[in-house]
């Protein structure tokens, strides 16, 4: 008796569509997890440098390693670093920051303009570890959103934070930021950091997937604008893509994976991409890879001049 074979689903390039399969070997798992582990090392490393300097007096060449907080800090006692969004709020209150703070904001702004503004979100911000955990639990438990909210809402929150800074005379977002609260709790043992973290975790877990980082956080919105023309991008290799959709399942900002736009640009061009690298490690076809914008060439558009001339001849 002849058995009827199931037809193999193919992508637009004619290749069979393959699902991502987690390798069984430890080495294979580490290849999938290597960017995640590197991100965690950076996030925890930054917190450890703050903590070690405050609690244990860490020094390098007689200078404190990293003092201050995630809004304004000093590296090795002489390199100022400042959150440009926090500085912008301070300026809007009518105060003029110190020259060192302005320089620190310029350094950070330049760094994220090169690497991608939302690299901050995926590689430095401690809240990312909390929201990643809630996203993982949602996938495991099959939890659905309670309601929908436009991802552009964060830009509205961004504008409101700036307006409130003008009207109240204080840096509005810095007072309620769960990022600042968590940092103060971890490093100095004061504030409502764990309460803020719990609120973000429960909101993301039960109410809205990536609710805080992907829909509400004005700092993420600010850095998305900064990163629009970043040099570091994720290259998109159109001929190898089978449209399997595995990347969109794990991406915290799936709207950036517009395959038509990516094919036209040869890369994920949206400033909302966090450059977390999840799509890179999950792609069965190695379609997505980090690259520099200058080395990414958009696919050549077909020359329709001759065909148009034939039609009008």
Ranges and model annotations:
Residues 1-266, 271-274, 281-313:
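Non-ligating segments of multi-cofactor redox enzymes
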């Amino acid at each position: 008796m002849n058995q009827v074979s199931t037809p193999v689903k193919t992508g637009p390039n004619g290749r069979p569509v393959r699902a991502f399969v987690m390798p069984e070997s430890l080495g294979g798992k580490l290849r999938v997890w290597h960017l995640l582990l590197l991100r965690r090392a950076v996030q925890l490393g930054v917190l450890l440098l703050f903590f070690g300097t405050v609690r244990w007096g860490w020094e390098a060449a007689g200078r404190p390693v990293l003092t201050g907080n995630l809004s304004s800090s000093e590296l090795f006692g002489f390199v100022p670093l400042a959150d440009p969004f926090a500085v912008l709020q301070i300026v809007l209150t009518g105060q003029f920051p110190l020259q060192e703070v302005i320089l620190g904001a310029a350094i950070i702004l330049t760094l994220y303009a090169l690497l991608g503004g939302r690299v901050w979100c995926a590689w430095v911000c401690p809240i990312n570890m909390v929201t990643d955990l809630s996203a993982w639990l949602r996938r495991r438990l099959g939890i659905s959103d309670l309601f929908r909210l436009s991802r552009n809402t964060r830009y509205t929150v961004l504008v409101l934070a700036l307006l409130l800074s003008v009207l109240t005379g204080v840096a509005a977002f810095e007072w309620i930021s769960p990022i600042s609260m968590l940092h103060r709790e971890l490093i100095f043992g004061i504030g409502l950091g764990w309460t803020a973290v719990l609120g973000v975790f429960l909101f993301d877990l039960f109410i809205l997937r990536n609710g805080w980082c992907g829909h509400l956080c004005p700092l993420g919105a600010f850095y998305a604008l900064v990163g629009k023309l970043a040099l570091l991008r994720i290259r998109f290799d159109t001929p190898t893509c089978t449209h399997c959709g595995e990347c969109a399942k794990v991406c915290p900002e799936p709207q950036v994976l517009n395959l038509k736009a990516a094919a036209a640009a040869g890369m994920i061009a949206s400033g909302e991409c966090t450059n977390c690298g999840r799509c890179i490690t999950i792609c069965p076809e190695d379609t997505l890879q980090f690259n520099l914008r200058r080395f990414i060439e958009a696919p050549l558009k077909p020359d329709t001049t001759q065909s148009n001339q034939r039609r009008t001849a």
